Swiss-Prot record:
It is found in: Cytoplasm. One of its GO terms (cellular component) is cytosol. It holds the Pfam family PEPCK_ATP. This is Phosphoenolpyruvate carboxykinase (ATP). ATP binds at residues 202, 221, 237-245, 286, 323, 448. It comes from Deinococcus radiodurans (strain ATCC 13939 / DSM 20539 / JCM 16871 / CCUG 27074 / LMG 4051 / NBRC 15346 / NCIMB 9279 / VKM B-1422 / R1). Pathway: Carbohydrate biosynthesis; gluconeogenesis. One of its GO terms (biological process) is gluconeogenesis. Mn(2+) binds at residues 202, 221, 258. NCBIfam families: pckA, PRK09344.1-2, PRK09344.1-3. Its cofactor is Mn(2+).
């Protein structure tokens, strides 16, 4: 059994404790090796411009196939409504045992990474995958340990993701042959049946969303950036509402594009990379993100290549949910360490598909609580399996599929943070104007960015009823 690649670092915790007996094991392989493995295994091809391009059997998340083990730890602490579906420990153990047996003799990839840039609050995670491209995605998206940290790496959480393993709903107690099961007592996530790489990061996001509130830390589905004067802004929103785009502002330094924690001293990124939606992306409107789609090391998910092998970002024939996964270092204007101070502005993004909401509104504390709990927006085509038209949705906390606790816990914690910090709260419409989707037009990026910049300086703007 091969246990190392040329650039691999020997971690202190391999995978024998799980009973896994792979035919070949790649521990912490680097970018060059993962390109070679992904191409050899037929997972993808290298675009003429450099990125690794892949196609997946599912082109979005599968929130209806996600389950949490109900046991003594979670029975009273998880909100068993909406997206939080219970499953028994026996079902989890049975599926894990079947996965371990299925993986025997197969080729596996392991990345040892951190979730979180704050050394005090991060968690070390062991990500075991069947696909080389998933391993590159994980390397891009999570925080990579130093060589010294790898020498003594001890994972607190483990993710085992084998897309070719499919559950039998009649036997295994799942909804379909796809499953994402979270076990807080065993500190483990197992997944099968889906190649969509976003499940890897969202699974751990859900773990942090459960763990951090108990420490007084507000976990957030938001992007964050910081101005020259140190003023931090947060952008809450569902997938496709503009979090990544607006946070990558040439005039401000990027902290992160999707997942953050708010402590008593500031904010920190949960990730080490970005996962940008790139359909119809242009170099003129979004030069920083566009450039990542041309870089070696980037993973392009479900992006079509033209005859010359160049990514065609305007082609949505596979899905509207085309994605670019890249290390945050590919963005030139980033905040060192991906941490910032106490936020001064909190922006709620909503992609109103009906042309009703105003472009910019300042919210009162009561309005903030209402908007955060209701989380009105529209699901954008492609971000979830089966969503082909914008659909009005009320996603609590701007991330209901990832929030294991009761929404009230998150709302009270956010209200406490906002009150203590004196941050201003805004509602910005990134959706349609002049009519609904298909009739009007979407707010231009430049206009939306100007609105969000205005919010940083509009101290004179009082809250208004919306």
């Amino acid at each position: 059994m091969t246990t190392a690649q040329p650039d691999a670092q020997p971690g202190a915790q391999p995978i024998a404790d799980l009973g896994l007996k792979p035919g070949q094991l790649h521990l912490n392989p680097g970018v060059d090796d993962l390109y070679a493995h992904a191409i050899r295994l037929g997972e993808g091809v290298q675009a003429a411009t450099g990125p690794l391009t892949v196609r997946t059997n599912k082109t979005g998340r599968s929130p209806k196939d996600r389950f949490i083990v109900e046991d003594d730890q979670t029975r009273e602490t998880v909100w068993w409504e909406g997206f939080n579906q219970p499953i028994s420990a026996e079902v989890f153990d049975r599926l894990l045992d079947k996965m371990v047996k299925y993986a025997e003799g197969r080729e596996l990839f392991v990345q040892q990474v951190f979730a979180g840039t704050d050394a005090e609050h991060r968690i070390p995670v062991r990500m075991i995958t069947e696909m080389a491209y998933h391993s590159l995605f994980i390397r891009n998206m999570f925080v990579r340990p130093t060589a010294e940290e790898l020498q003594n790496f001890q994972a607190e959480w483990t993710v085992l993701n084998i897309p070719s393993f499919k559950a039998d709903p009649a036997v295994d107690g799942t909804r379909t042959d796809t499953f994402i099961l979270v076990n807080f007592s065993k500190k483990m996530i197992i997944a099968g049946g889906t190649q969509y790489a976003g499940e890897n990061k969202k699974g751990i996001f859900g773990v942090l969303n459960y763990l951090l509130p108990a420490k007084g830390i507000m976990p957030m589905h938001c992007s964050a950036n910081v101005g020259e004067d140190g003023d931090v802004a947060l952008f809450f929103g569902l997938s496709g509402t503009g979090k990544t785009t607006l946070s990558a502002d040439p005039g401000r330094k990027l902290i992160g594009d999707d997942e953050h924690g708010w402590t008593d001293t500031g904010v920190f990124n949960f990730e080490g990379g970005c996962y940008a939606k790139v359909i119809n992306l242009s170099a003129e409107a979004e030069p920083a993100i566009y450039q990542t789609t041309r870089n070696y090391g980037t993973v392009l998910e479900n992006v079509v290549l033209d005859e010359s092998g160049t990514p065609d970002l305007d082609d949505g024939s596979l899905t509207e949910n085309t994605r670019s996964a890249y290390p945050i270092e590919q963005i030139a204007n980033i905040q060192p360490g991906s941490v910032g101070g106490i936020p001064k502005n909190v922006v709620f993004l909503t992609a109103d598909a009906f042309g009703v909401l105003p472009p910019l509104s300042r919210l009162t504390p009561e309005q903030m609580m209402y908007q955060f709990i209701s989380g009105f927006t529209a699901k954008i085509p492609g971000t979830e399996e089966g969503v082909t038209d914008p659909t009005p949705t009320f996603s609590t906390c701007f991330g209901a599929p990832f929030m294991p606790r009761h929404p009230g816990e998150y709302a009270r914690l956010l209200a406490q943070k906002v009150e203590e910090s004196g941050a201003k709260v805004w509602l910005v419409n990134t959706g349609w104007t002049g009519g609904k989707y298909g009739e009007g037009h979407r707010m231009s990026l430049n206009l939306t960015r100007l609105k969000s910049r205005d919010s940083h300086f509009a101290d004179h703007c009082p809250p208004k009823q919306v």
